[in-house]
C-alpha cells in the first residue's frame, strides 16, 4: 500500500522548517500559517512604501464595515504601524446605512475591533446625515436602483466622517478582486474616462481628502485566509439589497477567468493601469456643488439630486438623465435653495460601487484549493 504523503514543506524565504498549510492565491507559494501572515503583511507594507501612501503624523480614517476586507485592513494597518513605526494616528470610521438585520449586526463586529485594536471609533448614519435610511429608500423606490443611492451616500458619508474626526487621509478595504471587477465594469460601460483612473491606488487628491487602497494587490482569497489564520472576527452575511447589483455580474466573470488563468486578476489591474486616454476624450472638470459644497463635475452633486428626488417624489433624479434633472440644476444655478440638501463639507461624491465584503458559499469553495 502506498504511503500517504504529508503536507509539503513551507516555502518561506525565511528558512522555515514547518509544514505548509496554505497556498497563497496571489503567487501559489505554499506556506505555513505564520509565514503566510508575514508574507501578506509584507505585501501590504511594500505597497504602502512603494506608493508613499502616508506621511508621519497623519490622522488616517479606516473605513470599517465589519466585513472581512475592512477588518483585515484595520488589523494589518495597526500591526504595520506598530512594527514599522509609521507614526500614524489610526481611527475607525463606520457608516450606518439603516439596514435592519444587516448593518446593525455588522456594527457589532466593528465595536469588537475597536476594543481589540484599541482604536477610536466614529459612527455616522444615513438617517442623521440625509434624513433617510436605506430601508426607507428601498420602501419608496424598490430594489432596482438602491445600490446607486447607497453608493453615492456612503462615499459622501465617509468623507464627512473623515473630516469630522480631522483625518487627512481615508483608507478603504478595496482588494485586487474589487479593482479587477471595476476595470471590467468600466470596459463594459464604455466609460473610458473612469477606466483611466479606476485603478489609481490614491484617489481624490484634487480635493481635501485623498483616499488610499493599501489592499489593492491583495487577493480576496488571501484576505479570507489571513483573517482565519489570525482568528479575526468579521461579519460575513451578504447585504439583503445587494444580489441584483451590477457588480455581481462582473464578479462572476472575473472568477470564471481566474479558474482558467490564475493571474487574470492582476492582468486586469495592470491593463487598467496602462490605459492612456486620448486628448479628444473629455475628462470631467471637478468643481463644488452649488447646494452643499461637495466636489462634483456638475452644478449639483449626485447626492443632492438623489435627496431632492426622494423628498419631492421624483426618484429618477440623479439616477437617469432627464429634463427634471436639468430643471433642478438650473434652479440651483439661479440661486434657488431648498431644504433637503446633502449638507456642507468637503470631499467628493459619486457612486463608488461599494465593495462586497461577504464570504458566501462560492468563496468558501474557492478557499478549499488553498488549504492542505
Swiss-Prot record:
GO terms for molecular function: nucleotidyltransferase activity; sulfurtransferase activity; tRNA binding. One of its GO terms (biological process) is tRNA thio-modification. Coiled coil: none annotated. Residues 341-351 have a biased composition (Gly residues). Its main location: cytoplasm. Residues 335-372 are annotated as: Disordered. Residues 361-372 have a biased composition (Basic and acidic residues). It is found in: Cytoplasm. Pfam families: ATP_bind_3, zn-ribbon_14. Pathway: tRNA modification; 5-methoxycarbonylmethyl-2-thiouridine-tRNA biosynthesis. Its EC number is 2.7.7.-. GO terms for cellular component: cytosol; cytosolic tRNA wobble base thiouridylase complex. Keywords: Cytoplasm, RNA-binding, Transferase, tRNA processing, tRNA-binding. Belongs to the TtcA family. CTU1/NCS6/ATPBD3 subfamily. Plays a central role in 2-thiolation of mcm(5)S(2)U at tRNA wobble positions of tRNA(Lys), tRNA(Glu) and tRNA(Gln). Directly binds tRNAs and probably acts by catalyzing adenylation of tRNAs, an intermediate required for 2-thiolation. It is unclear whether it acts as a sulfurtransferase that transfers sulfur from thiocarboxylated URM1 onto the uridine of tRNAs at wobble position. This is Cytoplasmic tRNA 2-thiolation protein 1. It comes from Caenorhabditis briggsae. The gene is tut-1.
